[in-house]
Amino acid sequence: MLIIGIAGGSGSGKTTVVKAITEQLKGKVTIIPQDAYYKDLSHCTAQEKRDHNFDHPDSIDFELLCEQLQQLKEGKSVEQPIYSYVTCARSKDETVTVHPSEVIIVEGILIFTCEKAREQMDIKLFVDADDDDRLMRVISRDIIERGKTVD
């Protein structure tokens, strides 16, 4: 099993790189998005959720992510959380069953900030893009996918 880590700033093109690798390896890839491992904020007030810094490593449940990567390496399937940016919470009723595969791609803006996660990766890629291009992609994505406004 090969574990590839793909990191980069918001809107840098990580998803595009993941899609390109997946297309080349045709069905031999499992994708683990860092976004699924955001800590649940359902206990927080609306203001606390708005103020939460999703770009800080403490916002990620790296313990669970690393534990599940290890289980996949051992050939076991895992139940990946489902996180909603709209509610800032993990689904209490649903998970995604993730099965081991020849290649596992872990992608996200913060995945290289955790030493234990880095140690589990065989290949690490950092995706970079122009700041203005990234900003436009992030604004577009946040409005379309995450229910945010331009304000």
What is each stretch, according to the model?
Residues I3-G5:
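Short hydrophobic/aromatic beta-strand immediately N-terminal to the Walker A/P-loop
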Residues V17, I21:
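Hydrophobic positions on the alpha1 helix immediately C-terminal to the Walker A/P-loop
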